[in-house]
Amino acid sequence: MPGVKVKEAEPFELALKKFKKQCEKAGILSEVRKREHYEKPSIKKKKKAIAARKRAMKKQRKMMD
């Protein structure tokens, strides 16, 4: 769980920025978006296969250069 200790002279905006950065690193926002709506297992499997194909194509293009 991200947490930020705010110093006396530190502006709120800076503390908020630090908190947002920690949340992003922890993957909280992506997890919330992923859990927002139910996704059928078959669709999850399809997305995973598509992502694997994209990674393979990208790796292959990188090897060609």
Curated annotation (Swiss-Prot):
GO biological process: translation
Sorted UniProt keywords: Ribonucleoprotein, Ribosomal protein
Gene3D superfamilies: Ribosomal protein S8
Taxonomic superkingdom: Bacteria
Tagged with keyword S-adenosyl-L-methionine: no
GO-annotated cellular components: ribonucleoprotein complex; ribosome
Name of one Pfam family that matches: Ribosomal_S21
InterPro entries reported in the protein's UniProt record: Ribosomal_bS21 (IPR001911), Ribosomal_bS21_sf (IPR038380)
Keyword ATP-binding tagged: no
GO MF annotation: an example: structural constituent of ribosome
Similarity comment: family membership: Belongs to the bacterial ribosomal protein bS21 family.
Alphabetized HAMAP family for the sequence: Ribosomal_bS21 (MF_00358)
Entries under NCBIfam families matching the protein: S21p (TIGR00030)
UniProt protein name: Small ribosomal subunit protein bS21
Source organism: Geobacter metallireducens (strain ATCC 53774 / DSM 7210 / GS-15)
